[in-house]
């Protein structure tokens, strides 16, 4: 009985870590809120959000 409980807790912990990692990568892949201003501050002419990535045009 106790071993089943510990296996269940271990599986729940592993799943929570996997979900957390996936959510963090999704946030990092999202565009900067104002992509155009972000790119212009870096010295680019313009910037656009394409496929959840900020692309700067120099």
Swiss-Prot record:
UniProtKB keywords: Disulfide bond, Ion channel impairing toxin, Potassium channel impairing toxin, Secreted, Signal, Toxin, Voltage-gated potassium channel impairing toxin
Q: Where is this site: Aromatic residue of the functional dyad?
A: 57
The GO molecular function terms of this record are:
potassium channel regulator activity; toxin activity
Q: Which GO terms describe its cellular component?
A: extracellular region
Q: In which tissues is it expressed?
A: Expressed by the venom gland.
Top-rank lineage group of the source organism: Eukaryota
Q: Where in the cell is it found?
A: Secreted
Another remark in the UniProt entry says: Negative results: does not block the potassium channel rKv1.1/KCNA1, even at 50 uM.
Per the record, the similarity remark reads:
Belongs to the short scorpion toxin superfamily. Potassium channel inhibitor family. Alpha-KTx 26 subfamily.
Name of the protein: Mesomartoxin
Its ancestry begins with:
Eukaryota, Metazoa, Ecdysozoa, Arthropoda, Chelicerata
């Amino acid at each position: 009985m106790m071993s089943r409980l510990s296996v269940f807790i271990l599986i729940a912990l592993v799943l929570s870590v996997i979900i957390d990692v996936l959510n963090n990568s999704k946030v990092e892949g999202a565009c900067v809120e104002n992509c155009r201003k972000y790119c212009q501050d870096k010295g680019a002419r313009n910037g656009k959000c394409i496929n959840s990535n900020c692309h700067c045009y120099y």
